[in-house]
């Protein structure tokens, strides 16, 4: 049966317009993105099939072009469309973050860092550079690979803070394993960076670790 033959209240697009996007299942949201199905499958059937093939919506969103295009109903055009949608979401969060003080919008900080780092397959270390009113000046990824005391250089963080004319910074890195618990090395690194940045009167306000779920704030746990 075609989706056109379904009751209006059950059609994904009409359901979204009536109840909002949050009311839709992963399959219904994906069906709206797909727009059409394939022979023998409606858009919703195809969406359910793809979610089963990938294992989760997250895995589908994180797939590279080859992985994505290997599945029924998908190809380079859909991949490009999906990447554009994801990037618009990231830019929306970044713009929202820049409008307000980072300290007055802690959830906006979490949302942005989660969108920026959670899906990265390798460890990244970055900084949110803030002005004297704690408004965001810029976000920069500074280091790639294993994030420990040997791979993150305080002098490079200091150099970028000076270049941005920052008054404060929020540190962040991701744990691709999904476990957002700080290691002893994470705590030692945070202290080294605090000490280095204090020499140029730049405050470290927090260090967020991004894994599955909500990013962990080291400041909230008293680990700063």
Curated annotation (Swiss-Prot):
Q: Where is this motif: JAMM motif?
A: 173-186
Detail which positions bind Zn(2+). 173, 175, 186
Q: What is this protein called?
A: UPF0758 protein PST_0473
Q: Which residues form the MPN domain?
A: 102-224
The protein's matches in InterPro entries, at most eight in alphabetical order, are given as: MPN, RadC_JAB, RuvA_2-like, UPF0758, UPF0758_CS, UPF0758_N
- Record-level GO BP terms: proteolysis
Record carries keyword Hydrolase: yes
What domain of life does the UniProt record list for this protein's source? Bacteria
**Family, as annotated:** Belongs to the UPF0758 family.
Instruction: Recite the UniProt keywords alphabetically.
Output: Hydrolase, Metal-binding, Metalloprotease, Protease, Zinc
Give the Pfam families listed for this entry: RadC, UPF0758_N
Q: Specify the species.
A: Stutzerimonas stutzeri (strain A1501)
């Amino acid at each position: 049966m075609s989706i056109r033959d379904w009751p209006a209240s059950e059609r994904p697009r009409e359901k979204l317009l009536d109840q909002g996007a949050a009311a839709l299942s992963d399959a219904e949201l994906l069906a709206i993105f797909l727009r059409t199905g394939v022979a023998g499958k409606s858009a919703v059937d195809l969406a359910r099939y793809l979610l089963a093939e990938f294992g989760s919506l997250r895995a589908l969103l994180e797939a590279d072009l080859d992985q994505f295009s290997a599945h029924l109903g998908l190809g380079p055009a859909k991949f490009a469309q999906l990447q554009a949608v994801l990037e618009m979401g990231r830019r929306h969060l970044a713009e929202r973050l820049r409008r307000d003080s980072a300290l007055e919008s802690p959830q906006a900080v979490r949302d942005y860092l989660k969108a920026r780092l959670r899906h990265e397959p390798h460890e990244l270390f970055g900084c949110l550079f803030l002005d004297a009113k704690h408004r965001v000046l810029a976000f920069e990824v500074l280091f790639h690979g294993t994030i420990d005391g040997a791979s993150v250089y305080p002098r490079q963080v200091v150099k970028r803070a000076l270049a941005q004319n920052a008054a404060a910074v929020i540190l962040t890195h991701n744990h691709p394993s999904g476990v957002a618990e700080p290691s002893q090395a994470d705590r030692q690194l945070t202290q080294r960076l605090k000490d280095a940045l204090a020499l140029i009167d730049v405050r470290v306000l927090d260090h967020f670790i991004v894994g599955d779920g909500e990013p962990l704030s080291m400041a909230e746990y008293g680990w700063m």
